[in-house]
């Protein structure tokens, strides 16, 4: 109920809202929760109409340049906005490569601006994959125009899960940043 109210408030304030739940069945799928959240966000943009689509098409093309196909391969809805045809010589690297990570982060950065911060809500963080946690770490440390809300079941967090170290690291970063201010 709280998340639905947050979504309503975000939409009323013209913020973009992306939400997703990580999957317990196969937590090893790279970027699973982040991809679901971005698909949710793109669904909102697609419903806004042709003027908005054109604006986002320009923003995304400017940011991604010739690398949009990497993102389209994992988020096909993006092609509804960009209308790019994949060239025969374009190949998509493994989603775990540094190149893909950088382009994926650039893609997310397009939606986070000073005047319109992105609200990202991720549930069941305990099932997050390493790649998603890497993107979250980047967003938390490098991007100032995003509100990230995560939920997890503390009783399901074990030291062998990737999220265990992630939460500890984020808490340390927050404490360090707070003590410097």
State where each predicted segment sits.
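Key residue(s) within conserved catalytic/signature motifs
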Residues: 1-181
């Amino acid at each position: 109920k709280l998340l639905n109210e947050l979504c309503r408030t975000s939409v009323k304030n013209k913020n973009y809202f992306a939400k997703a739940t990580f999957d317990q069945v196969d937590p090893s799928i790279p970027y699973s929760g982040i991809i679901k959240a971005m698909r949710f966000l793109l669904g909102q943009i697609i419903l806004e109409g042709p003027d908005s689509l054109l604006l986002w098409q320009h923003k995304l093309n400017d940011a991604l340049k010739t690398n949009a196909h990497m993102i389209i391969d994992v988020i096909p809805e993006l092609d509804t906005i960009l209308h790019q045809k994949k060239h025969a010589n374009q190949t998509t690297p493994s989603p775990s490569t540094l190149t893909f990570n950088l382009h994926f982060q650039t893609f997310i950065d397009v939606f986070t601006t000073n005047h319109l911060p992105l609200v990202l809500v991720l549930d069941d963080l305990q099932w997050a994959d390493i790649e998603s946690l890497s993107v979250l770490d980047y967003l938390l440390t490098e991007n100032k125009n995003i509100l990230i809300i995560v939920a997890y079941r503390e009783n399901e967090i074990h030291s062998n899960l990737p999220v265990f170290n992630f939460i500890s690291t984020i808490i340390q970063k927050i404490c360090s940043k707070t003590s410097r201010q």
